[in-house]
Amino acid sequence: MATFDDLTDQQVTQLVAQAQNTFESWSQKSFDERAAVCRRAAAILRERADEFARLLTLEMGKLYAESLGEVQLSAEIFDYYAENAEAFLAPERLNTASSDDDAVLVSAPLGVILGIQPWNFPYYQLVRVAAPNLMAGNVVMVKHASNVPQAAAAFERLLAEAGAPQGAYTNLYATKDQLSLLIDDPRVRGVALTGSEGAGAVVAARAGKNLKKSTLELGGSDALIALADADVDKTVAWARHGRMFNGGQCCVASKRIIVVDEIADEFLDRFQVALSELNAGDPFDESTTLPPMSSQGAADDLNEQITAAVEAGAKAIPCGEPVPTTGAFVQPTILTDLTSDNPAYYQEFFGPVALFFRVKGEDEAVRLANDSRYGLGGSVFTQDVAHGVEVAKRIDTGMVSINHPTRLKADLPFGGVKISGYGNELANSRHSGVREQEAHQRRPDRRTGLTNTPLNIKEQYSWLTSLSESTWRPGSSRSDSSTTSWFPGTTTWCCSTSC
């Protein structure tokens, strides 16, 4: 057992000052120097995967195998940005209307970035903010969830051991009230939050009041649509994985299962069998496939949601043997007969509960998928991938997968629309708010033909040496046209032929 004291306001202010001082030197380091820290952090995670994974399972209860997977994913994200950040943030020559103009869009570090992160993926949520920002030259301060303090401390130690200077990454045992102090501090230049709708509204308002950049990921109620030609066996298997991964405590879990009439009966029968096969128990035991919830309070809240849904007219189908009464377990449950006047119809269920909807056809499936305040992820299952893409285009959400639940990968943009938040993280970070975008222009003096700056653009920006000469020849076309930029509100497509 360990205890962790909250910081005082004075300590918070001192840590911000330390972070700002570190930023002055960290932002001047080369990409190679910053990449060395991220690569070493990735290597440490892999070398001591068991140590880091066991801490996750002990602290928040997830299956040990899934904890190992999270450690691996976190290492991949560190490596991904170490490898790609310099290219992502490379200056971009602008095609201007006048041939006399020589303009370039450059990225400059922002400064101190505040992260406010949840407990369900204790390392992944941190590395998603830390890796791109550290590689961009920013420094990061994070208030992690109060129920994973040891994982929060372990991540800070990881980066220190990897060579990050003191102040480059700071773990904050801060109170909710101190978040206002942090966001109001002029040295804090941006905020990244993953959390509830209410928390997001408060943080966004505070950041907006201070005219600061922010990105928000506020949960979701992802729809999994099974079309008439879907392979039922494969779709049921993916539906169980998509709904029950991480004990069902995942923002991009397949929470709403929408199935067309032609296969609905068969699907529901097989889905019930699949959930009944889950084995509740010790998350360190390899035979366990259903872990406890993160806390008894979370389990109680979810059971109350189920009860309220049934009282409002839904039918609850409990699946499998009764779960243990000792521990924060919740019985895997399918809710059916949900109508729009039932509050559960629009709610997010954070745990092993699936909402099942039967629809007449594709159009109704799309309408139902879009009838939600949320818009984080979603998926379409069909044996016709091209048609699946066309259906996916009609779904109002931030990420859509074909024949696979929403994925978490370093090279796929992560972000939602509607009340699921705004801004994207992961993948190409140029447009994710981690850097300032600055347009630099040089124009020749028409009287002399000489430029009105004393140095040519490559001399002014000596750090542009990685770019080819053709990129910078006036009038030449961009050499990086294959780079994809992801803007807030853009839907990410991810297709698989596995179904």
Q: Where are the model-predicted features located?
A:
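N-terminal Rossmann-like NAD(P)+-binding subdomain of aldehyde/semialdehyde dehydrogenases
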Residues: 1-101
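Short, well-ordered beta-strand elements within core beta-sheets of diverse protein domains
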Residues: 2-7, 22-28, 114-115, 224-227, ...
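Conserved C-terminal structural/oligomerization subdomain of aldehyde/semialdehyde dehydrogenase
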Residues: 2-3, 188, 225, 279, ...
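Residue-level signal for inorganic ion chemistry
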Residues: 34, 56, 78, 137, ...
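Rossmann-like NAD(P) dinucleotide-binding subdomain of oxidoreductase/dehydrogenase enzymes
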Residues: 92-234, 359
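A short hydrophobic/small-residue beta-strand
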Residues: 139-141, 214, 316, 399, ...
